Amino acid sequence: MQLNSTEISDLIKQRIEQFEVVSEARNEGTIVAVSDGIIRINGLADVMQGEMIELPGNRYAIALNLERDSVGAVVMGSYAGLAEGVKVKTTGRILEVPVGRGLLGRVLNTLGEPIDGKGPVDNDGYSPIEVIAPGVIERQSVDEPVQTGYKTVDSMIPIGRGQRELVIGDRQTGKTALAIDAIINQKESGIKCVYVAIGQKASTIANVVRKLEEHGALANTIVVVATASEAAALQYLAPYSGCSMGEYFRDRGEDALIVYDDLSKQAVAYRQISLLLKRPPGREAYPGDVFYLHSRLLERASRVNANYVEKFTKGAVTGKTGSLTALPIIETQAGDVSAFVPTNVISITDGQIFLETDLFNSGLRPAVNPGISVSRVGGAAQTKIIKKLSGGIRTALAQYRELAAFSQFASDLDDATRAQLEHGERVTELMKQKQYAPMSVAAQAVVIYAAEKGYLKSVALNKVGHFEAALLSFMNSEYAALMTNINATGDYNADIEGEIKAALDKFVATQTW
């Protein structure tokens, strides 16, 4: 039988009409390009934003760009051995890190793997690094203090549990020192700490870990490290990993403190990844979502109410609120706080502590500028005794700076102006504090009381430090019960004021400084 051309044409049309295209979801793809830690994959039909993609050799990449015909992913770690044609698989999982009490005292990388040589970590489970922050109804107002141990901060820029307080300044102005001292001061407070080091030298981080260990604070702290030599992806993800580890304590009705050191380097790492993924650059070449990069991280620091904790723990913990307090650090260039990332983080946080190079170089350490440093919510959380006593400190310093500038041009000053200048000089001198020497609430209260009530008038400017040291030694030996009472309660009443006044009168009479 011979078919003519018309029949053949009809047969082909019939077959074409009967043909069904079956779309098959594939979870395996092929690398089509590798460059600078970025891989482009074809053939992944079923992948979600932020999903872990399994690579050969027990390595992973994270899918960040989902395009029409390919997926752009960033490799976590080394990309040696990855080449065009290599097969990869989706996992269906978002990146998770280990969490739990067993992480305290350990040094971990971004993925939660131990890098301190102390064996495997004893974790209570895993938590995704990206979690939606608690909503408005689940939160509670900030009304309990986090004592940093710094007179300047605790008296003028108080920090509350659940607050986000930015530490901002140029390089070498004492930002890390302030944050580390705040961690050291928590060893007796019950607040668990997380220190996230982003883009720093390994030697610097080793020194920080050693100092925490020396001062007995490492046992209470988790250190998460993404050094300068590690892949940009790990530097970008490190703060989210640390935050999940801190949230473990918050969600179980405990208090935690997290330090991000520093978010400028995280933003640079994210900019690098975004540019390599060919996302359109914006201001200062940062991508358009760099604000969201930091806002979604810092919003997770919060104080949650008892209902949230009870619901999260399925009734295992009742009547307890939890908190995660954040101290993000931002490094400025030549004091420019109006740059893109600093202004973003200032607008996200609940206040900022400005550290200035000029103050640091003049010997005022911590180099806090009280004029432009502010705590927007911490005032409600300040310890009662410090709040009552420290009201005049900020005013004295502000008046002193104004008068000091004016007095350079005035040949003769009246007695009132001279008295204000001398008081301001002594308060400024009193605010100086050595590193790794955080002060208790009672010690701060006694010292501030001495300044406010004029006990420093007769003390020579170069003797203020000696006066403070001798006063605290005297108080701890002669009035130990009073100091213990103030530390325990934080109260301030006529009886406590009378005792402090009597103690100071007795001390000043000895002239032992």
From Swiss-Prot:
CDD domains noted in UniProt: ATP-synt_F1_alpha_C (cd18113), ATP-synt_F1_alpha_N (cd18116), F1-ATPase_alpha_CD (cd01132)
Organism superkingdom: Bacteria
Site feature location: Required for activity: S373
Pfam families in the cross-refs: ATP-synt_ab, ATP-synt_ab_C, ATP-synt_ab_N
UniProt entry tagged with the keyword Cell inner membrane: yes
Stored Gene3D superfamilies: 2.40.30.20, ATP synthase alpha/beta chain, C-terminal domain, P-loop containing nucleotide triphosphate hydrolases
Main location: membrane
Similarity section: Belongs to the ATPase alpha/beta chains family.
Protein name as catalogued: ATP synthase subunit alpha
Organism annotation: Shewanella denitrificans (strain OS217 / ATCC BAA-1090 / DSM 15013)
Gene transcribed to yield this protein: atpA
